[in-house]
Amino acid sequence: MESVSGPRQKAWLDCLPDTPNGAWLRTQLLADSPALVLSWERFFSFQAGRDPLDLLACSRALAAIGAYEEAAQKLRLALAHDVRHTFFSRAEKLVYRLAGLVRSNLRQCKIAVLGSSTTNLLVPILQALCLRDRIGAEIYEGSYGSIKQEIWDANSGLARFRPDIVMLFMHWRDLHLGAVTDDEEVWISQFIEERKADWRRLSDSFDCHIIQPSFDYPASEAYGHLASVLHGGRTRVIDLLNLRLREEAPANVSIVDMAAAQREVGTLRWENELAWIRYRQHPAMEALPEFAAAYMSHVRSVLGLSRKVLVTDLDNTLWHGVIGEDGLDGIGVGPGSPEGEAHLHLQRYMLDLKYRGILLAVCSKNDFEDAQLPFLRHPHMALRLKDFAAFRANWEDKAANLRAMGHDLSLSLDSFVFLDDNSLEREWVRSQLPEVAVVEQGSSPFHYLRQLDRGRYFESLSLLGEDLARADQYRVEAKRTSLRTSSCSLDDFLQKLQLEGTVEEITEKNLARVTQLVNKTNQFNLTTRRYTAAHVYAIAQDPNGWARAFQMSDRMGSYGLIGMLCCRPVDRGDLWEIDTWLMSCRTLGRQMEKFMFDRLVEAAVDRRIGRIVGVYRPTAKNGLVKDFYDQMGFRRVGESDDEVRFELDVPATPVVTATHIRNVTASAGAVRP
């Protein structure tokens, strides 16, 4: 519909009622202007759900008047839906425009795309998903079919680009397998060695993270099911190869499960023979959003943007019915009804998330006692009260409850995922807390689990002991909070805790956990530099620098490995510069930062370091530590838009500042700092 102007426009607009249809017609009649934006917002106020194409149109209107951050937010809301590849084509120009203008990104990174098939339709989708995930990405697209040349040519475009992350796009045709391979083990070993050589070259050249796909399967097999059982059968060889890829991949290489993506899309939609023959397009265009989403889940994990908390509603989400109206016998969960079984399957999935370290929380409009009743007395509930790190059941709005929950858990809201059957509640949380990931689950309980899983919100590249113990740690933290409340002062509380600290070298044993902290810690993080495992290890191995990891415990249990501090040597031999100083927010207010400072000064005295330079690089999340160096006795020596620099003259005799933490490093057998 063409827009109109002047008296004719006014006449049209004056005739339109203030209804959903009237508001939509206004959006079609108005040209780009603030009035058009207001018309879109009025239209959205009538809607329980929002169509991605309407959100895209509103985003364009906002961008046209220079409201780029607001435009990006509307586009992010559109991209949070399950959109088809045609949507990305419509949004492409706007995505690239906003990518260069928005400043609300959480991370910046350089991503290289190297493919054996055509990637020019894939890259715009990746760019859009980066915008959705608040990643300021500069993307380099290698030439078609030139993976080897890009990796091994010292003068290639990749070498000039110097990526942080390299995405490799390969598929079953690259294996050049016949229906049957004579010696499958020899062939697999040779192929793996070629991949490992490429990985080493990339790692040595760029210190980057590599995202390598496992291999998908041909849509047609002449041998049928025999291809998976015969020695050397193509399906069997691909199965074994994919297993070896996962086993052989080093820490800085993650393997994308292409077989899972192929299953998600469906083999018949995954491949388009005509598109391959004509354009060397693989997978098919309609499969590209799912294909790109699989890779982006790894990017988020590498950058520390995976979600940590699943917050769920109760009525018609964890069970069928309303507990306050239907009572314990009236709600449905478990055997007895299809809906009840669907809710039980969702609970079991959530319980598995909890076992792998994801925190579970409840946010429900309910009376507190009613909300707890099914967890205490219903025989078929898979989840129990002990499985939740936070439980909020009241009549306050859910956005306010989520904010309070974030404060209580000491976690930022961009680590939250929100699950609710009520579309109005979902829209309210989206509008008030855009950083929270809201699952667009629909209204049928048979879709809840699938939609939650498809979001890949909790993707992780490794599973550490600290992850598995996370839920227990938060339960113990509740006991500490109770002790704090009963203590007459902070000193009294810290004394009762009986805190102990340990300092240890960064080795292959703890490298994964240290790297995880480097890429996930936001609040107590002086520089917020993000490094690969290889980079962290290289810093730790510098004989002229100093890098240590820190553990903490008290009378109630261990906090685990919760901090890292590393210094780089400066040109002159008696000067260190603090490269990274970070600490888990779970230990705030326990003097752990002072314990780390004390160990740093001890090491500096031992190494005859005269001065230590501290650097504070402000971000949207680390304002907590903006005055930290001042508090620790450093003096300000310089300031720019990007950072503030401090210096400390190392005292001849160290003074203990962490008076409430006992250093048990020696008794634990760790290396002297």
Regions found by a protein language model. Name each.
Residues 408, 430, 434-499, 602-673:
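Terminal substrate-recognition subdomain of acyl/acetyltransferases
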Residues 377, 502-586:
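A conserved beta-strand-loop-helix scaffold within acyl/acetyltransferase catalytic domains
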Residues 552-555, 561-639:
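Acyl-donor binding region in acyl/amide transferases
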Residues 5-52, 65-68, 77, 101-106, ...:
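Alpha-helical cap/lid subdomain in secreted, periplasmic
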Residues 82-142:
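Serine-esterase "nucleophile elbow" of acetyl-processing enzymes
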Residues 308-323:
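Asp-based phosphoryl-transfer active-site loop
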Residues 402-423, 429:
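Conserved Lys-Pro-Asp/Glu-containing loop-to-beta segment of HAD-superfamily phosphomonoesterases
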Residues 345-376, 392, 429, 526-531, ...:
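Substrate-recognition element of Asp-dependent hydrolases with the DxDx(T/V) motif
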